[in-house]
Curated annotation (Swiss-Prot):
Belongs to the bacterial ribosomal protein bL28 family. One of its GO terms (biological process) is translation. It comes from Ralstonia pickettii (strain 12J). One of its GO terms (molecular function) is structural constituent of ribosome. This is Large ribosomal subunit protein bL28. One of its GO terms (cellular component) is cytosolic large ribosomal subunit. It holds the Pfam family Ribosomal_L28. Keywords: Ribonucleoprotein, Ribosomal protein.
Length: 77
């Protein structure tokens, strides 16, 4: 399973570790992904999503029903 948020599309990005001596080595910044179940009242069922913390805040703001409409329009769920 890819490390991608199903709501926001956040994915790992690449950067550098920088030491005190300014040596640089490649590293990955991973999104803060959580596996969460959401109760969808309109469908009377649970929906499991792999979402980032930013995605959880978006669901709190817009509501799970509106987020699912957007996901289905993109063809993700």
């Amino acid at each position: 399973m890819a490390r991608v948020c199903q709501v926001t599309g956040k994915a790992p990005m690449v950067g550098n570790n920088v030491s005190h001596a300014n040596n640089k080595t490649k590293r990955r910044f991973l999104p803060n992904l959580q596996n969460r179940r959401f109760w969808v009242e309109s469908e009377n069922r649970w929906v499991s999503l792999r979402v980032s913390n930013a995605g959880l805040r978006l669901i709190d703001k817009k509501g799970i029903d509106e987020v699912l409409v957007d996901l289905r329009a993109r063809g993700e769920v």
